[in-house]
Amino acid sequence: GGIPRHAFGIRERGTLPQVGDNLGIPAAQAVAERLSQGMLSSKHGGGVVGSSAGVSGFDLIKRLLEVPKSAAGNATVAHTDGSVTSIQDAPQGGKYVFIDNERHYVSPDNTLLVNAGDKVEAGDVITEGYPNPAEIVKHKGIGEGRKQFVDIFKKALVENGINTQRRNLEILSRGLINFVRITGNEELSGHLPGDLVDYDSLSEIWKPRQDSQVLHPSKASNKYLEKPVLHYSIGTRITPSVSSNLKKFDVPEITVNDSPPPFEPEMIRAMENLSKSDDWLVRFGGTNLERSLLDSVHRGRTSDLRGNSHLPSMAIGEI
């Protein structure tokens, strides 16, 4: 779950980070400070430029972090692979876009980005505006979801007159988008079906299944990654766009399986992130403390004082 010091780059003091440095705290602080300054400036300056169906400023940032299941003006995301078979006027206004006969509603506030005959993949954004990041994570996986979240969040900040380094957003996305839901019928590393599990922790102990194959990306269409490659995470489906990107970076082979792994990606709202941690001390930084503590006792959860979170060390007075 750590970050190589050279991958992070030079810090604000002009040196590479030391092994053991917590990079999440300064990254979150840098983003929060810029956000606060931007909101104060907009308050005294008469608003901000840039919106998505009337949503802008702090409301837009909050929407991207809290990922409500439905919100007026959200960009439409394709739920399936296929071709755009037809585009029809909706009686309530807006459009119906049919992708292989599956209907997608497009708000009249959003401009279509596809035409009849276009091919799309599940998770593609088919209108202008800001999509719900959770939908992208659901269809494209943890890794691609993190990447697109950074792009979306960066765009939202810039359009509202706020700038920050991309690497800070990358660290933020890694913390926010890091859960999978166990879907198999059997226990997986101590977790039961339906459990929400930390992806980084699970990926460290995950071993490719016995019937997995090592193939060239061009021969792995519609199979599922068993080992991470580039920014793509375990369980990512090899679609034409994924295959094309792997070819672009000269990836010679990947480990894949015909079936998805027994878990699926799930992005939860930022406010619930800490309370869903596997570490019982980290949970004390979240909400619903009584329920979290009782669940931790029931599951026999432990705490790692040398883990990625600063909260356990803070709890025992080390920092």
Predicted regions and their residues:
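Intrinsically disordered, low-complexity regulatory segments
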Residues: 1-319
